Amino acid sequence: FIDMYASNPALRSNIGKALAGRRQQFIIQGHLCATWENDQYLRTRDVEKTIASFEDQLTRLHTDYLDIGMIHYVDSEEDFHEVFNGPIIRLALRLKEEGKIRHIGLSSHNPIVAKLAVESGLIEVLMFSINPCYDLQPPSENVDDLWADESYAHSLENIDPEREKLYELCEQKGIGLDVMKAYGGGDLLSKTNSPFGKAMTPVQCIEYALTRPAVASVMVGCKSCDEMQAAINWCNATKEEKDYTPVMAGMEKFSWQGHCMYCGHCA
C-alpha cells in the first residue's frame, strides 16, 4: 500500500520504475489536487491543473489507474463546500466512472470536515491524522494547532468526542480509514519532543492507530532501511511490545480514566 501525496515528478518516476512488472501487487493511493509548480509541491483546486497532475502521475507510474484517488488536504468547511459542490468532485466521479480511479477518498486533519465528507456518501476512504496526542485535541481548521506546544500546556482528558464520533461513523458506514502522522512527525518517538514526556516506539504508535475503529492501514514515512524495519517489526511484535498504555499512564496532565482506549486490556 503506497500513499503518493507528493507531486515531485522525479519521485513519481522512481516509484514507477520500482513498480515495473509488479503493479498488481500494490495498492496505490494517489492524490487529486496536489501539483508541482516552480520546483515545489502545491495544493490546488484548479481543475485543469488537477487533471494535468493526475495524468502525469499515471504516466510516470506506468499505470492506467489508481486504486484510490484521494482528494487532497481539505481542512476547512469553506474548502469542503468548494470541493464537493464544484468541478473537483465531478472530476473524481468521472475518473471513477472511467475506471481511472477505483475508489474516491479524502484527506483531512479536521474531524468536523472529515465527518461532512463521510456523510456525503461520495467517499469510500478517509485519510486522517491519528495518534494518541492528536486524538486529545479539539477540531481545528489550522493543522499547525495539532503540534503547537500551547495545545498541550493545559490538562487534557480523554479522546476528543468529535474524533471519536468520526472513527465510529466510519466503521458504521464501511469507510476505510488510512492513517497519516502516526508518529506525530517523529515527536512521539522522542522523550524530549513528545507531549507525554516519554518516547513511544514505532510499534506502539502503529498499534495505537490500528486499534482505532475503521482503521485499515497506517501510512508510515521512512527515510532509511532501519526506519522501514522499525515499522515492519509490528508484524512480529509481542502483545507486550505493542502495548501503548504504559506511555500514557501516570501523567499529570493527561487522563483517560473511565474512557475506552481500545487497548483490549479489559477483554
Model feature map: region roles:
Residues 1-30, 64, 97:
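N-terminal binding-site loop/beta-alpha segment at the start of enzyme catalytic domains
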Residues 47-58, 91:
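Short, well-ordered amphipathic alpha-helical segments that serve as non-catalytic structural scaffolds
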Residues 21-51, 72-75:
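Structural motif corresponding to the early beta-alpha repeats
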